[in-house]
Amino acid sequence: MKKIIALMMALAMVASMAACSNSADNESQAPASGEPATSETAENTETPAAELSGTVNTDGSTSMNDVMAAFIESFGTIQPDVTVNYSGTGSGSGITNVLAGTVDIGLSSRALTDEEKAEGAVENIVALDGVAIVVHPENTVTDLTTEQIAAIFKGEITNWSEVGGPDGAIAVFGREAGSGTRGAFEEILGIEDACAYTNEYSSTGDVIGNVASNPNAIGYASLSAVNDTVTAVAVNGVVPSEETVADGSFAIQRPFVVVTVEGQELSPAAQAFLDYAMSDEVADIITAAGAVPASLAA
């Protein structure tokens, strides 16, 4: 009998010790009132983006104006203390300036050349854009082949009647040397340094505005910038649109490029803006600005 009582007392003591141990463990796991959560709790809490400040200077393509304006506005809601400046001086100037270190990021509406890459320029493609062939709204010509377009810009076709239009001498409008739009247009058609321009302009807006005011004019412009003051003709039977640029069926298209320099560390603010511009977050923003996100290209 005494052995049974002793055994029962021993079992009771073991149970009591186990209960005390569990209680201590629970107390050690629960934070005291007013104290921060343990690392296990913190792991379940999302960390917001680091708040940055400073200025990011960008320079280059005028065709990227709408995309850059949208990027800057949207990025400002994430990093309100970062100021992003955009200067539309042309693709060539933007590439030159980023390589010289006078701006943080360059902007180009054409692919980088092998020479520019050899100098350290890095090509970050954010979108694709069609180069629309634009005419006056009263012009009855609605479709041109790439061969006809090349012949018009080289001065081999000089009257609209030669391509099914009204009788009238064609006024050929284009961009200035160094323009990314001009570089892409001439390269795609194989007419580099062979164009017979009536007038050259320093911005996409100037080309569109002058074509809109001249019934005999033809020009080229970023599809994302085309408005109802001009008509964008079909090329080889394909109407320029975001869809035909994305699927590759529209023949005259080029990339929108954010240019950085190999081995050159960006400021935290500039790096954050670059990361944002290259992220999937901006796909809808690019589309709303009239371009095609690079991720959607065929």
What spans do the regions from the language model cover?
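Exported/periplasmic ABC-transporter solute-binding proteins
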Residues: I4, S21-D25, A30-A32, P36-A100, ...
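C-terminal motif of bacterial Sec signal peptides marking the signal peptidase cleavage site
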Residues: A15-A19
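Positively charged n-region of N-terminal signal peptides that target proteins for export
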Residues: M1-M9
